[in-house]
């Protein structure tokens, strides 16, 4: 039986990054898919620590909060930088990803029709810090921090992929980010996962907007 279990809705959502991480690292995991009907029934929601998913099980350890799960996997699988300085930078990147993801989620679920144009106009300013970070790390030719992949890379990759769907061409003005997406997406195990039905057939969000 796989050591990991992901309990989540049938969407990519906040689990896409951790699934990419597990697939790329050659880890197996079990999916427990929660339908809207099951969630609305209420008992599962009541059992969740914060009343929300994802829920993640690593043996007898149960975790909630998607970024906590990513950090846990970062620590246990060696994806948290090579020293404390790199770990701090990885945290900084991941917090920046979370800031933009929250804005994206707010747009998708509360203000898509009225707010999309303004969101897309402001997007270059939101993406620029990540281009800057890449430029400061070995000329942008490796990862977002250091010379080995971290959990923040998977989270940033997912963030960039969903924004390419929302605003095609949004990375055209950011050559390092554009190359970064291509480079990470071409990693053999990750490439296979991104082409798999388990990824392709899942909607990005739960309301059909993207």
Curated annotation (Swiss-Prot):
SUPFAM superfamilies: GST C-terminal domain-like, Thioredoxin-like. The modification N6-succinyllysine is found at residues 103, 116. It is found in: Cytoplasm; Mitochondrion; Nucleus. It comes from the Eukaryota. Its main location: cytoplasm. Its EC number is 2.5.1.18. One of its GO terms (molecular function) is nitric oxide binding. Coiled coil: none annotated. One of its GO terms (cellular component) is ficolin-1-rich granule lumen. Keywords: Acetylation, Cytoplasm, Lipid metabolism, Mitochondrion, Nucleus, Phosphoprotein, Transferase. It catalyses: RX + glutathione = an S-substituted glutathione + a halide anion + H(+); prostaglandin J2 + glutathione = prostaglandin J2-S-(R)-glutathione; prostaglandin J2 + glutathione = prostaglandin J2-S-(S)-glutathione; prostaglandin A2 + glutathione = prostaglandin A2-S-(S)-glutathione. Glutathione binds at residues 8, 14, 39, 45, 52-53, 65-66. The modification Phosphothreonine is found at residue 62. Residues 2-81 form the GST N-terminal domain. Changing residue 8 to F: Reduces catalytic activity about 50-fold. GO terms for biological process: animal organ regeneration; cellular response to cell-matrix adhesion; cellular response to epidermal growth factor stimulus; cellular response to glucocorticoid stimulus; cellular response to insulin stimulus; cellular response to lipopolysaccharide; central nervous system development; common myeloid progenitor cell proliferation. CDD domains: GST_C_Pi, GST_N_Pi. Residues 83-204 form the GST C-terminal domain. InterPro entries: Glutathione-S-Trfase_C-like, Glutathione-S-Trfase_C_sf, Glutathione_S-Trfase, Glutathione_S-Trfase_N, GST_C, GST_pi, GST_superfamily, Thioredoxin-like_sf. Homodimer. Interacts with CDK5. Belongs to the GST superfamily. Pi family. Conjugation of reduced glutathione to a wide number of exogenous and endogenous hydrophobic electrophiles. Involved in the formation of glutathione conjugates of both prostaglandin A2 (PGA2) and prostaglandin J2 (PGJ2). Participates in the formation of novel hepoxilin regioisomers. Negatively regulates CDK5 activity via p25/p35 translocation to prevent neurodegeneration. This is Glutathione S-transferase P. It comes from Homo sapiens.
């Amino acid at each position: 039986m796989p050591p990991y279990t992901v309990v989540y809705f049938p969407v990519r959502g906040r689990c896409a990054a951790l699934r990419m991480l597990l697939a790329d690292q050659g880890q197996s995991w079990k999916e427990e898919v929660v339908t809207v009907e099951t969630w609305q029934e209420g008992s599962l929601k009541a059992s969740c620590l914060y009343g929300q998913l994802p829920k993640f099980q690593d043996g007898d350890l149960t975790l909630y909060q998607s970024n906590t799960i990513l950090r846990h996997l970062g620590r246990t699988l060696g994806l948290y930088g090579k020293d404390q300085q790199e770990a701090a930078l990885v945290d900084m990147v991941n917090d920046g990803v979370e800031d933009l993801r929250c804005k994206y989620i707010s747009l998708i679920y509360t203000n898509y029709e009225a707010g999309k144009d303004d969101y897309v106009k402001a997007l270059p300013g939101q993406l620029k810090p990540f281009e800057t970070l890449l430029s400061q790390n070995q000329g942008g030719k490796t990862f977002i921090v250091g010379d080995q992949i971290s959990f923040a890379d998977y989270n940033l990759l997912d963030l960039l992929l969903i924004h390419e769907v929302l605003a095609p061409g949004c990375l055209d003005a950011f050559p390092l980010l554009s190359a970064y997406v291509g480079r990470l997406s071409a990693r053999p195990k990750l490439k296979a996962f991104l082409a798999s039905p388990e990824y392709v057939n899942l909607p990005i969000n739960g309301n059909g907007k993207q």
